[in-house]
C-alpha cells in the first residue's frame, strides 16, 4: 500500500534527543521511574510525536506510549495509524472494540488490513463469518468512524461476497485512494464495486494459495476483467503502486499483458507475481519489446518485482538512462544482468528459484557492481559435494556493504562452521541475519548457541532469525519448519561476549523480555 510519509526523510535520533535535553533536566526522560515520567510530560508533544513516527518497530512505539497516560493519549494517532488484523481473533476483538467500546479510535486509522480466517499458525482456529467482518467495516464507515482512512486491503478466504463493502468505503471514506483484495476459488465478478474507484494511488489484487483439493473449483481460464483495466488505465492516471500477485504454488495464472498499456507518471512500486505476459495469441518473445518500453516510460519506479514464469520476459534490455530511481528489485538471476541502475540498487531479492553453485558464481560477478547493495535475499540449492565455505565466502565478498542477509539453503545438511568461518573471514558487517536451512532429524541444533556463535563472529549483528527443516522444499512459502528461533543481540557482557535473548511471544503478541523504550543509550 502507498505510504503517506514517503516524502519524509528520517529525523536523526541524536537531533531529537538534543531537543529533549533542552526541555527536561533529566536526560533519561524515558526511564520507568515516576520522576522521569514527570519530566517526560514536560517534553513538547510535537517532539514526542516526531520520535514515535520515526520508530519502525510497532512494539517500541507501544513501549514509548506506556511511559505515561499523557504520552499514551498523545500517541494514539501514531499507534492506530496502521492497523493490520492478522487473524480471525484479532479481527473479531478489534472490530467489536471499535464498534462498541472505543468508537473514538477509528478516526486515527489511516491504513486498515483485515485477514479473517488467515492461515498464519498451525493451531486450529474457529472459522470467522467473513460477512460479519465486512458488515462491521460497513457500519464503521457509514457511522463516520473511519474519516481518515486512506488504504484498505481485504485478505479473507474469498473476496467479499457483499459488494456494499466497496461501495460504502468509496462513498464514506473520502480520503481512500488505495484498495485491494485477494481472490479465492470463486471467479472474479466483472461488475464488482471494487472496480468502480476513481483516481487510485494504489491497487492490490492477490490470488489465494489453495489446497490441492480446491483446484477443481478454479475457473478453467481465469481472466482479469476489463473493468479492472479500465479503472487502472483510464481512471487512475496518478497511480503510484500496483501489485498483481499470484503465488508460485497456485495453478491460477492471470494474463497481465494489458499492464503495458498503462502510463502512470507517478508509479513508484510495481509488483507482478507469477502472472503471464503471453496469452493465447502471443508469445513471450512478442511481449518483450512492449514491456521494455513500458519500463522505460516509468522513470519514477523505485521498487520492481518481476515473476519467474517462462511466459514472462526473461531478460531486461533497457537504455542506459532508464529507471534512474530504482532502489529495490526482485526477479530472476537473468533479470539483474540487464538492469541499467545496478550501482544504486540497495535491496535485491533472488528467491523465485533456487540457484545452483554454477549460477551463483555468475550472480556474484553481477553483485560486485552493486556498490550500494545493503539488503540481499537469496535462495541456494547446493549439492553435497559443494565447497560450502567457498560458496559462502564468494557470496559475502561480492557484496561487502550488506547489513541485512536473508539466506535460504534447500539442499542436504551442511556444517554451520562453514558459514560462520566464511562470515568471520569477510568484511561484511551484518545487522540482521535470517538463515533457513535443512538439518538432520537426529541432530536437532541448539538455536540459542548458534545465534550466540553468529553474534560472536559478527559483532555488528543485532537480530538473528534461524529456521530449519528436516526435509527439502519446493517453494519458499511452504517450508515445513521444525523450529524457528528469533533472537535479539543486546549489549555486550562484562566478559566481552554478546548477550543473546530469544524473542518469545505471549498470546497478546508482546515479547517476554521487552521493557518500556529507553532513549538513554542515545544520550
Language-model segment annotations:
Residues 1-61, 65-74, 87-104, 138, ...:
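Eukaryotic N-terminal targeting leaders
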Residues 4-6, 18-24, 34-37, 46-51, ...:
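Leucine-rich solenoid repeat modules
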Residues 36-132, 154-159, 184, 313, ...:
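Hydrophobic regular-secondary-structure patch
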Residues 52, 85, 114, 151-154, ...:
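Conserved beta-strand positions
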Residues 83-95, 158-162, 184-189, 250-252, ...:
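Acidic-and-aromatic substrate-binding clefts and catalytic sites of carbohydrate-active enzymes
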Residues 92-96, 126-139, 221-229, 285-289, ...:
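Well-ordered, non-membrane alpha-helical segments in soluble/globular domains
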Amino acid at each position: 500500500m502507498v505510504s503517506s510519509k514517503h516524502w519524509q526523510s528520517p529525523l536523526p535520533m541524536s537531533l531529537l534527543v538534543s531537543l529533549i535535553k533542552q526541555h527536561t533536566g533529566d536526560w533519561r526522560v524515558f526511564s520507568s521511574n515516576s520522576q522521569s515520567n514527570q519530566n517526560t510530560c514536560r517534553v513538547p508533544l510535537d517532539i514526542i510525536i516526531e520520535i514515535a513516527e520515526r520508530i519502525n518497530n510497532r512494539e517500541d512505539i507501544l513501549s514509548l506510549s506506556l511511559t505515561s497516560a499523557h504520552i499514551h493519549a498523545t500517541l494514539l494517532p501514531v499507534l492506530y495509524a496502521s492497523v493490520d488484523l492478522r487473524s480471525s481473533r484479532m479481527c473479531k476483538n478489534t472490530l467489536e472494540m471499535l464498534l462498541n467500546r472505543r468508537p473514538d479510535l477509528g478516526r486515527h486509522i489511516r491504513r486498515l488490513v483485515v485477514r479473517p480466517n488467515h492461515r498464519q499458525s498451525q493451531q486450529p482456529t474457529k472459522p470467522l463469518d467473513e460477512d460479519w467482518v465486512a458488515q462491521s467495516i460497513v457500519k464503521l464507515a457509514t457511522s463516520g468512524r473511519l474519516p481518515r482512512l486512506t488504504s484498505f486491503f481485504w485478505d479473507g478466504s474469498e473476496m467479499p461476497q457483499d459488494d456494499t463493502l466497496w461501495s460504502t468505503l468509496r462513498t464514506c471514506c473520502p480520503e481512500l485512494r488505495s484498495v485491494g483484495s485477494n481472490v479465492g476459488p470463486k471467479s472474479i465478478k466483472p461488475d464488482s464495486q471494487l472496480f468502480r474507484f476513481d483516481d487510485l494511488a494504489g491497487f492490490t489484487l492477490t490470488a489465494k494459495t489453495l489446497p490441492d483439493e480446491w483446484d477443481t473449483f478454479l475457473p478453467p481460464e481465469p481472466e482479469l476483467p476489463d473493468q479492472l483495466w479500465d479503472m487502472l488505465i483510464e481512471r487512475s492516471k496518478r497511480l503510484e503502486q500496483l501489485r498483481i500477485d499470484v503465488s508460485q504454488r497456485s495453478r491460477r495464472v492471470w494474463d497481465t499483458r494489458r499492464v503495458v498499456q498503462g502510463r502512470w507518471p507517478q508509479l513508484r512500486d510495481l509488483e507482478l507475481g507469477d502472472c503471464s505476459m503471453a496469452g493465447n495469441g502471443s508469445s513471450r518473445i512478442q511481449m518483450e519489446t512492449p514491456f521494455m518500453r513500458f519500463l522505460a516510460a516509468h522513470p519514477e519506479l523505485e521498487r520492481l518485482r518481476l515473476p519467474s514464469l517462462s511466459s514472462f520476459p526473461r531478460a531486461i534490455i533497457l537504455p542506459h538512462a532508464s529507471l534512474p530511481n530504482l532502489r529495490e528489485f526482485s526477479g530472476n538471476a537473468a533479470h539483474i544482468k540487464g538492469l541499467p541502475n545496478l550501482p544504486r540498487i540497495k535491496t535485491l531479492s533472488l528467491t523465485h528459484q533456487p540457484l545452483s553453485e554454477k549460477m551463483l558464481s555468475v550472480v556474484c560477478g553481477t553483485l560486485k557492481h552493486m556498490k550500494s547493495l545493503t539488503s540481499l535475499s537469496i535462495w541456494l540449492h547446493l549439492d553435497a559435494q559443494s565447497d560450502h565455505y567457498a560458496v559462502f565466502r564468494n557470496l559475502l565478498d561480492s557484496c561487502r556493504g550488506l547489513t541485512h542477509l536473508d539466506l535460504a539453503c534447500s539442499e542436504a545438511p551442511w556444517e554451520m562452521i562453514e558459514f560462520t568461518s566464511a562470515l568471520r573471514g569477510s568484511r561484511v558487517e551484518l545487522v540482521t541475519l535470517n538463515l533457513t536451512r535443512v538439518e538432520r532429524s537426529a541432530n536437532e541444533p541448539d538455536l540459542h548457541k548458534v545465534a550466540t556463535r553468529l553474534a560472536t563472529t559478527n559483532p555488528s549483528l543485532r537480530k538473528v532469525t534461524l529456521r530449519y527443516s528436516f526435509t527439502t522444499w519446493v517453494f519458499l512459502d511452504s517450508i515445513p519448519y521444525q523450529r524457528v528461533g528469533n533472537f535479539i543481540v543486546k549489549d555486550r557482557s562484562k566478559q566481552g561476549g554478546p548477550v543473546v535473548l530469544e524473542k518469545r511471544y505471549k498470546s497478546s503478541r508482546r515479547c517476554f523480555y521487552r521493557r518500556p523504550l529507553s532513549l538513554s543509550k542515545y544520550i
